[in-house]
């Protein structure tokens, strides 16, 4: 499917992660599925880009410099009249963190390492 046609056309995803390898692998996979990808390397940059670019979905790492994924998620939920869809990714195994993310309104919570097909499936479900 071409990037400029079909249901994915114009769908923009903001990746917020401080790990360059993860950003690159996610970006390549999502672009291969026809999505436009924006990148932020820390929580503050992620919030600024989200406010300026109004993405359809945010993929958010939990542990980042300057502002954690939790703080970004909380701010996203408070500042937008229509909540943006958010997938939180983390290497953290703790169930308390997942419960807190769910309390803040995360749409999906995926633990690293994960198969790219699992992430793409979540993206497609949330953007359909």
What are these regions (language model features)?
Residues 19, 62-63:
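The short loop immediately C-terminal to the conserved phospho-acceptor aspartate in CheY-like receiver
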Residues 23, 65-66, 94:
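The feature encodes the CheY-like receiver
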Residues 24-32:
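Charged docking surfaces used in two-component/phosphorelay signaling
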Residues 42-45, 68-72:
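Acidic catalytic/metal-coordinating carboxylates
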Residues 53-59:
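Active-site beta3 strand of CheY-like receiver
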Residues 71, 93-108, 121:
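Alpha4 helix (beta4-alpha4-beta5 surface) of REC/receiver domains from two-component response regulators
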Residues 114-124:
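C-terminal output helix
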